[in-house]
Amino acid sequence: MGLYSPESEKSQLNMNYIGKDDSQSIFRRLNQNLKASNNNNDSNKNGLNMSDYSNNSPYGRSYDVRINQNSQNNGNGCFSGSIDSLVDEHIIPSPPLSPKLESKISHNGSPRMASSVLVGSTPKGAVENVLFVKPVWPNGLSRKRYRYATYGFLSQYKIFSNLAQPYSKNIINRYNNLAYNARHKYSKYNDDMTPPPLPSSSSRLPSPLASPNLNRQARYNMRKQALYNNNLGKFESDTEWIPRKRKVYSPQRRTMTTSPHRAKKFSPSASTPHTNIASIEAIHDAPQYIPNVSWKKLPDYSPPLSTLPTDSNKSLKIEWKGSPMDLSTDPLRNELHPAELVLAQTLRLPCDLYLDSKRRLFLEKVYRLKKGLPFRRTDAQKACRIDVNKASRLFQAFEKVGWLQDSNFTKYL
């Protein structure tokens, strides 16, 4: 082992330990190492001496020269008494220098480039097998455009073929719905399936993130153009690019569905006469209500007005939601009893319509009495040409004052 050559700690584990206080042992060890080194130099045919070895020594040339002089004077390769001063100057040899970053020779002898050459500097000559890394994020590239470009690149592989397809379909459907909701404010594709043209002032790639200086129509056209270019050929057929036609719903008449196990419920109408009423033959002259005309063509089987109390006009009062009708200017108001006038105002029936409904109700009562049939609330609803709820209130009011008793109609039998 050389004097100044470092050695790993693992190789020194089996050696004898030398204490720091035993200075004579240190000198003896140094003399042995120098003697072995001189013997090797003498046996070398090249004739190297300590001065040649000192070129690789970490210490100065003057230190090596002094060692050579002492060894030559003694002749036996041992140090003289001046070794103490030498050891005092350099007690412990310093470790070798660490490799520099600029060194171009590695431990295995293969050439390599220094780190300072690859970082922040340009090599002077042509260097092979060197990878230069440059930034790949161009100016103006946003996150959304980068995501679109990445999806478009990955969709070229079969494993990522469905990466951009559902996302693009959703965008197309959303834009179509927005266009329909705006009442076709935006332009659609033509019959030849050509997308809307781009603005002439736009020189960059079409993107959903358009310039805020463009108007709303131009930004919409740019988004449609970008979707058309990026997704052309990814769909199964070209028909998916056709905007869906909006269905125009026309108001249809509701029809009643009848179950075979359920009897059909008949709903009376105020305008259509019923054919299953008993007085169908008596109303052939006035089957429908005609203002100020139909009530005069119907026979009057009503009880006399004298049967109503004269001191009160609330004998026919019923409950009805809604504000009453003002009949103070009606020309037929004198044909009604004051209690009947209050009833007509409450049910919001003009005087001629009230007289028409009154005569139809009692006409049905007489004809059913002739046939021996009872007169019920539903019979009154079928006979009158008014709302069924108002006809029920008329039946309730007339029954309260006793006008529906059979004794009032025995003279017509």
From Swiss-Prot:
One of its GO terms (cellular component) is Rpd3L-Expanded complex. Keywords: Phosphoprotein. GO terms for molecular function: chromatin binding; transcription coactivator activity. It comes from the Eukaryota. The keyword Phosphoprotein applies. The modification Phosphothreonine is found at residue 194. Residues 35-55, 189-211, 249-271 are annotated as: Disordered. GO terms for biological process: chromatin remodeling; regulation of transcription by RNA polymerase II. Residues 316-413 form the SWIRM domain. Residues 35-51, 200-211 have a biased composition (Low complexity). PROSITE patterns: SWIRM (PS50934). The modification Phosphoserine is found at residues 207, 211. InterPro entries: Homeodomain-like_sf, SWIRM, WH-like_DNA-bd_sf. Transmembrane segments: none annotated. FUN19 is a non-essential gene. This is SWIRM domain-containing protein FUN19. It comes from Saccharomyces cerevisiae (strain ATCC 204508 / S288c) (Baker's yeast). The gene is FUN19.
